[in-house]
Amino acid sequence: PSFAIKKHDDLFIYLSDRLLEENEQVRKVARDCLRKVAPIFPSGCEEILRRELRHEAKQHRNDAFATLKETSRNWVETGCLHLDELIREDDVDLRRRGAKILRTITAKGGATGWDLITWSLQDEDAQVRRSASACLPALANVESRVATILVESSMFDEDSGVKKNVIKTLKTLDMESPRVAQLIQDGARDRDPELRKACINQLSIILTGDKLREVATELLRQETRPELRTRLERLSRDVDWEGTEEEKNRALAPLDKVPEEFSEIQSPEI
C-alpha cells in the first residue's frame, strides 16, 4: 500500500493477475495484499474485489468478504455499492454473506443503507433476514423513525432469530410515539409467546390508568400462559380500589427516615 501511494501505475493490474496465478501460495499472498490495499484504494480495487467476491473457491470468497468488511468501515459508499449488487444475486451464499456485513454500514449508510436493510428483511432466505434484523437495534439509535417502520414490517416474521432481534429493538424505540405504542399492543396479541411477553411488559410504559386496564382486560380474555395471565391480571386491576392491603400500602410514599441523632433524644419528663 505505501508503495502504491507513490507509484500506482499498473500496480492493480499486476495484483489482479497474481490473483489468477496457478500457484496457490502466490494467490494467497495476493489476497493478503488486496486486503491491505482495498481499504486505502477502494476505486482501484473495485473490479478486482467484485470478481473475488464471486470466486468459486471458498478461500478466495472468504478473504474477499473479509476485505469488503474492512473496506466498508473506511468507505461506506464503497460498501453500499458492493452490497447493493450482492443482495440482488441469485446465489444465496452471496446474499447471506453480504447481509452479515450490513451492520458495518448501518450507522453511516444513510438512506442507501436503510434501503439495503429493508430489501434484505424481505429476502426469501431466513438467514439473510436474520442478519438484516440484527441491524435494527443499532439503527434505532441513529434513526428511530426508520427503525420503527422496519420493526413494524418484521414483527410477525416466522423466523425466531428475526423475532429475537425485533424484541431487542422494541425496547429501544421511542415509547412516546403513537406508532410504537400500537406496535406493542399488536405484539401483545401475537402467537409467539416471547413476543407477547416482551410487549406485555412494555404496556405499563406506553399506557396508564383506564386505558391500561382496558387493554390488559381485553388481552386477558385470550391469553393462556399462566405467567402472562398473572401479569395481565395485575395490570387490569385498579390497586387503589381492588388491591389487597399490602398492594395499597406499597403504593403509598414511605415515611422519611429519622436520623439516628434525633431518634436517640429522649422526650423531656413532665
Regions found by a protein language model. Give the residues of each.
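Amphipathic alpha-helical scaffolding segments comprising HEAT/armadillo-like alpha-solenoid repeats
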Residues: 6-18, 40-52, 74-86, 108-120, ...
